[in-house]
Amino acid sequence: MSRLTVYHQSTPDIPNKVLSHHVDIAATLAELGIRFERAEASLPVPAGAGQEEVIATCRGEIDAWMAKGGYLDIDVISVDEDHAQHMPWQAELLREHRLAGEWVLCVVAGRVQISLHVGDYLYSVLCERDDRLVVPAGMAHWLDMGERPRIVAMRLFTDAYGWRPDYVEPSAHERFPSFEG
């Protein structure tokens, strides 16, 4: 079940709000300019599937997003427990960063926690299969796949160069609870 946990930076270990109903999560995030949607994935895709397989399986949804949102690039995150140690870029996703363009996180299988740092608050969204999160340009965030990752997700970018992080220093991610997975 998807979940939104909101923290104030002065009390990073005590949530101010915890929501688990899709409508409540979407309404809270909409106030920040973030869209939270549900869309059924095309077909099941196993964690650890290659980028080509994921894109081929989800081609219809990708084409729809590209057409309606002006997205120019896509990448795939596909990790399972057996291959997690071979993914050194996971540490880069955990560092707080911003992207120049709007981007979409489409969770196809498994789960991932995305933390969005807005002003004095952290909005931590546990996204699961079929969740779609549209993040505005310039919003500080990080992705946490947990200690035992099992995730297949697509990221669509309005920036033609894809994922080009602008890291935030100091990063806030170490002050807040991590995703246990």
Where are these regions (language model features)?
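N-terminal leader/capping segments at the start of a protein or of a new domain
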Residues: M1-K68
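Conserved metal-binding segment of the jelly-roll/cupin
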Residues: C127-E147
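Double-stranded beta-helix
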Residues: G146-G181
